[in-house]
Every structure is written in structure tokens, then in C-alpha cells.
């Protein structure tokens, strides 16, 4: 009997409580600052693509939704000839962003990717490239890749020193 009265009181309180429903397209709830949404490819400050087609993003992707085809410029620099992401399979885990050595792949807070056809959720390189530098303005991979840091140079290790 006590359980029934408790239930009736709880329902009575909830009837007069304010609603928490949000009319979604017109009103949007605030997203967390680090929300992971749509993936974009960024550019260097000089306007070139940051992606070097190393395929680390595709290897890190747990659902295998990234496909990269590598090409090479006459001066020997790699670039993605095609870069495709299937957002129908993407789980927005962020592993591709973490694996990217050049900060070319970045996740934006844009989470509205719904579509009526699954084929429209496959984005090509042209759809993913943005004109800006993304989260890391001024960063250029080729300025820091392979350069020695002053004071960090060490002598080569003798393998015999590693033995007990």
C-alpha cells in the first residue's frame, strides 16, 4: 500500500513539474566544448594541404571508414590523390585526429550530418578540405619535421653498454 501511495505522489509531482523538452531544429542544446563531430582536412599557412598521405589515420580507424590513395609530387612530397571518409560508418572516436602527425585531420563540433541516402555520407577530399588552418594556426609540418632541437642531441648508444 505504501508503494502505491509513493507512486501516486511521485506522478503527481511530475505532472506539475516544468517540461524539459526542447524543440530541436529551432532550439539547440549547447554542445560540450570538446564535442567530436564532422572531420575536416586543413591547410598549411601557405595554402597547401597538410596531409602527407601516410595512411596512419586509416590504420588507426577502428571501423575502417577512411580510404587514402597516395601520390607523389615531382619534388618527392607525398599528397593524397584521393581521401574518402564514409560518415555512415564513422563513430567519431577521434583516433584519426590523434594519429595524424601533421594535424591535417581535425574534428569539428558540427554534428548535424543526417541524410536520407547512405551514399551521400561518403565525403571526398574536395568536401573535406577547408580553406583555413583549423585548430593549429601557423603550424607547418615541413618546418619542424626532421630538424634537430638545440641541446637535445645525444651521442650514439653503444650496444655493449646495454648488456648486464
Swiss-Prot record:
Positions bound to [4Fe-4S] cluster 2: 61, 90, 93, 96
Organism of provenance: Cereibacter sphaeroides (strain ATCC 17023 / DSM 158 / JCM 6121 / CCUG 31486 / LMG 2827 / NBRC 12203 / NCIMB 8253 / ATH 2.4.1.)
Sample GO molecular function, one term: 4 iron, 4 sulfur cluster binding
Any Gene Ontology biological process: aerobic respiration
Record carries keyword tRNA processing: no
Name of the protein this chain belongs to: NADH-quinone oxidoreductase subunit I 2
Gene that specifies this protein: nuoI2
Family: Belongs to the complex I 23 kDa subunit family.
UniProt-annotated binding residues for [4Fe-4S] cluster 1: 51, 54, 57, 100
Keyword Iron-sulfur: yes
Note on cofactor: Binds 2 [4Fe-4S] clusters per subunit.
Cofactor: [4Fe-4S] cluster
Principal subcellular localization: membrane
Chain's role: NDH-1 shuttles electrons from NADH, via FMN and iron-sulfur (Fe-S) centers, to quinones in the respiratory chain. The immediate electron acceptor for the enzyme in this species is believed to be ubiquinone. Couples the redox reaction to proton translocation (for every two electrons transferred, four hydrogen ions are translocated across the cytoplasmic membrane), and thus conserves the redox energy in a proton gradient.
EC number annotated for this UniProt entry: 7.1.1.-
Amino acid at each position: 500500500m505504501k508503494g502505491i501511495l509513493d507512486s501516486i505522489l511521485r506522478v503527481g509531482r511530475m505532472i506539475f513539474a516544468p517540461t524539459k523538452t526542447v524543440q530541436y531544429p529551432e532550439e539547440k542544446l549547447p554542445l560540450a566544448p570538446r564535442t567530436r563531430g564532422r572531420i575536416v582536412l586543413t591547410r598549411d599557412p601557405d595554402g597547401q594541404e597538410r596531409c602527407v598521405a601516410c595512411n596512419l589515420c586509416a590504420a588507426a580507424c577502428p571501423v575502417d571508414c577512411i580510404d587514402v590513395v597516395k601520390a607523389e609530387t615531382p619534388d618527392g612530397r607525398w599528397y593524397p590523390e584521393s581521401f574518402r571518409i564514409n560518415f555512415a560508418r564513422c563513430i567519431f572516436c577521434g583516433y584519426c585526429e590523434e594519429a595524424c602527425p601533421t594535424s591535417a585531420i581535425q574534428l569539428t563540433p558540427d554534428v548535424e550530418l543526417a541524410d536520407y541516402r547512405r551514399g551521400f555520407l561518403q565525403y571526398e577530399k574536395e568536401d573535406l578540405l577547408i580553406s583555413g588552418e583549423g585548430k593549429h594556426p601557423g603550424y607547418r609540418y615541413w618546418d619542424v619535421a626532421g630538424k634537430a632541437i638545440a641541446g637535445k642531441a645525444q651521442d650514439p648508444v653503444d650496444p655493449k653498454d646495454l648488456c648486464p
